[in-house]
Curated annotation (Swiss-Prot):
Protein name: tRNA uridine 5-carboxymethylaminomethyl modification enzyme MnmG
InterPro entries (UniProt xref): FAD/NAD-bd_sf (IPR036188), GIDA_C_N (IPR049312), MnmG (IPR004416), MnmG-rel (IPR002218), MnmG-rel_CS (IPR020595), MnmG_C (IPR026904), MnmG_C_subdom (IPR047001), MnmG_C_subdom_sf (IPR044920)
BP-aspect Gene Ontology terms: tRNA methylation; tRNA wobble uridine modification
Residues the entry annotates as binding FAD: G13, G14, G15, H16, A17, G18, V125, S180, Q370
A Gene Ontology molecular function term of the record: flavin adenine dinucleotide binding
Keyword field: Cytoplasm, FAD, Flavoprotein, NAD, tRNA processing
Cofactor: FAD
Source organism per UniProt: Sodalis glossinidius (strain morsitans)
Coiled coil: none
Binding-site residues, NAD(+): 273-287
Disulfide bridges in this chain: none
Transmembrane among keywords: no
């Protein structure tokens, strides 16, 4: 044998799903092969130069909690960090980082190249090696055959990808890369349900041609947030601002006048696009009452002149793209350096997958990322990690693992995909999780790091840091419980000004911190209750666990209760539009199916667990919580 050709796990594709899958498998001790058509594009950001956001940041933290790569890479490549929803409760706060594409890609590649048990090889895959209903390897474009006990497909938008710019279209996996036509054809020969989806990207603009003096400036947060539980702000490169402009009546008129030249509106594109990241032509038509749409001008890196105009994804012809850009303030003389485009690609119905992301039809074959109908780097990376660890477990002869809905956003993601499927690119939101108070960014490690350790994903450094943090949290909570103060105590005159009402009875530190007007920093600034913890992560946990203790306990009770509501009856001939909080889509499905019980309602495609929770609350208020015999 002149070259290694037998592995435990093969990963096909080196994007965000593929890199996490490869790292997970290799960390668990499996000999892993990562096949990519171009080593230089490992971890490439094909669309927006950013990581995180509402729901997405939660996934990144969960990946990190289990030893994954994405959070550590963005800490090294992020050029602007912000906490979204900072003024709201901890459940919906989310970290977002603007990325330097080059630095991020370098961080990913560096981690991969230094990972034991992982071999990277540059070759496109054209076929799978099958033995009956089991996959046993892959064949590359020059006929090399590699065998493995498990294969993970993380091929993104490359399967029979077709790029559209106006009425022109050509084959491509993304701009500048070839599609994967042979592999797409081979997969279509297997017993999968296949369909087409669409996504898009905006034109890129030369920063030298923008009049920034006419734009609003958006800076990052101070102090600087970090993504990884092991990270620090010292790892971040130089931080720079983003800028804001707006579409206007002129922009919208240009779009309306050229809809006949849009491949989407002309019926040339058959794939369904992302509902929550629509093209600018879609936004103008769907929200005709809006006078303007906010556009964020995001730098693509510290050494790049390219600007990503977040909010004007389009497949309109290039001349129309120029008119759209020039219609906006500050961009009147802007130069486009890369045209925007839409891309259509194959995706495979995720209802054909187990919750481990292994195919129900082909043993040993796993799917992760956009091939499953999702959109976004974070959704892809989370699936990649799960598929990679389960491919490794299969190779080791062990049972698969997947998180529950009350355990992780990753659990929500795979349950939604594998149970309900999707007809449009699926994006994660906090609203998709019915137990979001438990599934916060800040406690992702407390939820998942111990599991990651048991699975073999978490190294000694992370584990020791995690155990020390847990110990600090419990020790500090006990310390606050043990410190009592009463109205006549020494130092109460320092405490009372911090309270809405002066102390009238004895209270300990935890009880004081539970008050809405008190926070951990102010409490521990008092000599009696100080000093504060130096570890900011542990200090944050102490405050959240104490302040939200009652709410968290109630949500844990709700989880147990939800399991008991399978046979709870719904009123006959019920009009679900009378239930406040249900989406129009859910109301339509419930009124159409007329379920007799909560159990039946929960199995209707599109009726989310969050909607079931709303129904249970409504039944309780109406005094209708009856169970069938």
């Amino acid at each position: 044998m002149f070259y290694p050709d037998h592995f435990d796990v093969i990963i096909i594709g080196g994007g965000h799903a593929g890199t996490e899958a490869a790292m997970a498998s290799a960390r668990m001790g499996c000999q892993t092969l990562l096949l990519t058509h171009n080593i230089d594009t490992l971890g490439q950001m094909s669309c927006n130069p950013a990581i995180g956001g509402i729901g997405k940041g939660h996934l990144v933290k969960e990946i990190d909690a289990m030893g994954g790569l994405m959070a550590q890479a963005i800490d090294k490549g992020g050029i602007q960090f912000r906490i979204l929803n900072a003024s709201k409760g901890p459940a919906v706060r989310a970290t977002r980082a603007q990325a330097d594409r080059v630095l991020y890609r370098q961080a990913v590649r560096g981690a991969l190249e230094n990972q034991p048990n992982l071999m990277i090889f540059q070759q496109a895959v054209e076929d799978l090696i099958m033995e009956g209903d089991r996959v046993v390897g892959a064949v590359t474009q020059i006929g090399l055959k590699f065998r493995a006990r498990a294969v993970v497909l993380t091929v993104g938008t490359f399967l029979d990808g077709k790029i559209h710019i106006g009425m022109d279209h050509y084959s491509g996996g993304r701009a500048g890369d070839p599609p994967s036509v042979s592999l797409s054809r081979r997969l279509r020969e297997l017993p999968f349900r296949v369909n087409r989806l669409k996504t898009g990207t905006p034109p890129r603009i030369d920063a030298h041609s923008i009049d920034f003096s006419r734009l609003a400036t958006q800076h990052g947060d101070d102090p600087l947030p970090v993504f990884s539980f092991l990270g620090s702000a010292d790892q971040h490169p130089r931080q720079i601002p983003c800028y804001i402009t707006y579409t206007n009546d002129k922009t919208h008129e240009v779009i309306r006048q050229n809809l006949d030249r849009s491949p989407m509106y002309a019926g040339i594109i058959e794939g369904v696009g992302p509902r929550y990241c629509p093209s600018i032509e879609d936004k103008v038509m769907r929200f005709a009452d809006r006078d303007a749409h906010q556009i964020f001008l995001e730098p693509e890196g510290l050494t790049s002149n390219e600007i990503y105009p977040n909010g004007i994804s389009t497949s309109l012809p290039f001349d129309v793209q120029m008119k759209i850009v020039h219609s906006m303030q500050g961009l009147e003389n802007a130069r486009i350096v890369r045209p925007g485009y839409a891309i259509e690609y194959d995706f495979f119905d995720p209802r054909d997958l187990k919750l481990t992301l292994e195919s129900k039809l082909i043993e040993g074959l796993f799917f992760a990322g956009q091939i499953n109908g999702t959109t976004g780097y974070e959704e892809a990376a989370a699936q990649g990690m799960l598929a990679g660890l389960n491919a490794a477990r299969l190779a080791m002869g062990k049972d698969g693992w997947s998180p529950r809905r009350d355990q992780a956003y990753l659990g929500v993601l795979v349950d939604d995909l594998c149970t309900l499927g999707t007809k449009e690119p699926y994006r994660m939101f906090t609203s998709r999780a019915e137990y979001r108070l438990l599934l916060r960014e800040d406690n992702a490690d407390l939820r998942l790091t111990e599991t990651g350790r048991q699975l073999g994903m978490v190294d000694d450094v992370r584990w020791e840091r995690f155990c020390a943090k847990q110990e600090q949290i419990e020790r500090e909570r006990q310390r606050l419980r043990d410190i009592w103060v009463h109205p006549g105590s020494d130092g109460v005159e320092q405490l009372n000004p911090l309270l809405k009402a002066s102390l009238t009875r004895e209270a300990n530190g935890e009880e004081l911190l539970r008050r809405p007007e008190m926070d951990y920093a102010r409490l521990t600034h008092l000599e009696r209750f100080g000093p504060a913890l130096v570890d900011s992560q542990a200090a944050e946990q102490v405050e959240i666990q104490i302040k939200y203790q009652g709410y968290i306990a109630r949500q844990q009770e709700e989880i147990a209760r939800q399991m008991r509501n399978e046979h709870t009856l719904l009123p006959a001939a019920m009009d679900f539009s009378t239930v406040s909080g249900l989406s129009n889509e859910v109301i339509a499905k419930l009124n159409d199916h007329k379920p007799n019980s909560i159990g039946q309602a929960s199995r209707i495609s599109g009726v989310t667990p969050a909607a079931i929770s709303i129904l249970l609350v409504w039944l309780k208020k109406q005094g209708l919580r009856h169970r069938s015999p």
